[in-house]
Amino acid sequence: MSLHSPGKAFRAALTKENPLQIVGTINANHALLAQRAGYQAIYLSGGGVAAGSLGLPDLGISTLDDVLTDIRRITDVCSLPLLVDADIGFGSSAFNVARTVKSMIKAGAAGLHIEDQVGAKRCGHRPNKAIVSKEEMVDRIRAAVDAKTDPDFVIMARTDALAVEGLDAAIERAQAYVEAGAEMLFPEAITELAMYRQFADAVQVPILANITEFGATPLFTTDELRSAHVAMALYPLSAFRAMNRAAEHVYNVLRQEGTQKSVIDTMQTRNELYESINYYQYEEKLDNLFARSQVK
């Protein structure tokens, strides 16, 4: 694969920042905003695709094609490496997992995480989760690794076992997943900082901490996560939640006041939007490329 492969870029980012802050980008515009803010890697949440693109809950309803559409839109305009939530692999067989891996590589993703929940999955921070056997998840990991067409594409294992089977069993599963070929680990819904260190010591691969709001995991700081040997800090829906609250407020104000004057100062200006999407460069190219056709 080329030196500019997304997977290689993601691995390089891990060496430059500790922990690597990875922010969720719900769409291509947000990916560009994250890039302008100086982030080195971005994320596409499965729950974000469901809620943001489809208006549906994160209950395994989204399809692979739904996710691929959003991946392509982001990677078409943003050069930051994109980590993608692949849920359980979008199907019950190893061939489904393999197709997911190959398709995401073609779409420009840097890596994915695949989890050990059952097909009727739930949000990782909701109660009543159910997980497959350790052996079935190992098969998912093996299928994902075997399907890689880019050796630098990242296969990350997510385990939801802590809430279902307890810490010791979750660590045992994590070790099996790494032995099967997972290169990084995402232990979901961690409740204590020290647990991250226990996972890190047990598996000796980079650990991702999901610092999502309003869930089971406290909002640990990057300093705290670094002390626990966490390599990646993920903020999957932070900007999306803020965007939704801002939109809701503007809609209500417009409805109640009949004008947007009282909220205009909270808005991104036209010029700021144009700068974030490189509008002026496109316009200049348009003028240069098609100037002759405009002369009558």
Curated annotation (Swiss-Prot):
Outline what the protein does: Involved in the catabolism of short chain fatty acids (SCFA) via the 2-methylcitrate cycle I (propionate degradation route). Catalyzes the thermodynamically favored C-C bond cleavage of (2R,3S)-2-methylisocitrate to yield pyruvate and succinate via an alpha-carboxy-carbanion intermediate.
Q: Which residues bind Mg(2+)?
A: 85, 87
Question: What is a single molecular function from GO for this protein?
Answer: methylisocitrate lyase activity
Q: What class of enzyme is it?
A: lyase
Q: Which Gene3D superfamilies does the record associate with it?
A: Phosphoenolpyruvate-binding domains
Q: Say yes or no: keyword Glycoprotein present.
A: no
Q: How does it assemble?
A: Homotetramer; dimer of dimers.
* Originating organism: Escherichia coli (strain K12)
Coiled-coil residues? none
Q: Which InterPro entries match?
A: ICL/PEPM, Isocitrate_lyase_ph_CS, PrpB, Pyrv/PenolPyrv_kinase-like_dom, Pyrv_kinase-like_dom_sf
List the keywords (alphabetical).
Answer: Lyase, Magnesium, Metal-binding
What gene name does this entry carry? prpB
Q: What does the entry list as the binding residues for substrate?
A: 45-47, 123-124, 158, 188, 210-212, 241, 270
User: In which domain of life is the source organism classified?
Assistant: Bacteria
Protein name as it appears in the record: 2-methylisocitrate lyase
Q: Which cofactor does it need?
A: Mg(2+)
Pathway noted in the entry: Organic acid metabolism; propanoate degradation
Q: Could you tell me the EC number(s) of this protein? A: 4.1.3.30
Q: Name one Pfam family in it.
A: PEP_mutase
* UniProt record similarity statement: Belongs to the isocitrate lyase/PEP mutase superfamily. Methylisocitrate lyase family.
User: For this protein, what reaction is catalysed?
Assistant: (2S,3R)-3-hydroxybutane-1,2,3-tricarboxylate = pyruvate + succinate
Which GO BP terms, alphabetically? propionate catabolic process, 2-methylcitrate cycle
